[in-house]
Regions:
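Solvent-exposed serine/threonine-rich low-complexity stretches and specific carbohydrate-binding patches
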Residues: 102-111
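Bacterial N-terminal signal peptides
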Residues: 7-16
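Short tyrosine-centred short linear motifs in exposed loops/low-complexity segments
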Residues: 115, 125-129
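Short acidic/polar inter-strand loop motif in beta-rich domains
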Residues: 136-146
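Sec/Tat signal peptide C-region and signal peptidase I cleavage site
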Residues: 17-22
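Aromatic sugar-binding surface patches on proteins
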Residues: 111-118
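Short amphipathic, basic-aromatic surface patches that mediate peripheral association
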Residues: 64-82
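Short coil-to-beta strand junction motifs in C2/discoidin
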Residues: 58-61, 78-89
Length: 177
């Protein structure tokens, strides 16, 4: 009887254990801008669907993500912690001390740990990098807001940029993945 109870308890514990996620590496501390919490991270390249030309995960060094969630003071009607949809998020990465740079637009996507904006990217090897994100509000993607007195919310924020500096150690190194 005791063995059955122990097995049952272990089975229940295993069923409530959170799923294992790929190890994310923070690019910098989260910041709050215009009622939004921004937190950029990277992890190993991932496979995504639908697969568009140039999206083969094997050809990249990392998967770049930025989580964009509502702050407790979000004036556009999003609940605290809610993911903000319909953004246009572009990025530019420069290797410090050199000429190398890359840029692109992140795609809205979801994963086991929730929705985010992301893309598989290449780095120019290990080194110190600066990344700049440009965040454009939802009306650029045709997401509207109420403006009447009874149900309206504050106007969308103006497009803005945020930057971080970070060290990329490369694949398979401590601080890499």
């Amino acid at each position: 009887m005791r063995i059955r109870i122990v097995c049952l308890v272990l089975g229940l514990l295993a069923s409530v254990t959170p799923p294992a996620f790929a190890r994310e590496h923070s690019i910098g501390n989260p910041v709050v801008v215009d009622g939004l919490i921004l937190h950029p991270v990277y992890l190993q390249p991932v496979h995504m669907a639908p697969v568009l030309p140039g999206m083969d995960g094997a050809k990249f060094d990392a998967h770049l993500e930025i989580d964009v969630h509502a702050d407790k003071n979000n004036p556009q009607g999003f609940d605290p912690g809610a993911w903000i949809p319909y953004l246009t998020v572009s990025y530019e990465i420069k290797k410090m001390g050199g000429d190398w740079s890359t840029f692109g637009t992140l795609l809205a996507m979801t994963a086991a740990d929730g929705p985010h904006y992301g893309a598989n990217i290449r780095f120019d090897g290990p080194g110190k990098y600066r990344i700049r994100f440009r965040i454009m509000p939802p009306p650029y993607q045709a997401f509207f807001r109420h403006t009447d007195k009874e149900t309206g919310v504050s106007p969308w924020w103006r497009p803005f940029e945020e930057s971080w500096e970070f060290t990329y150690l490369g694949v398979g190194h401590k601080g890499g993945y």
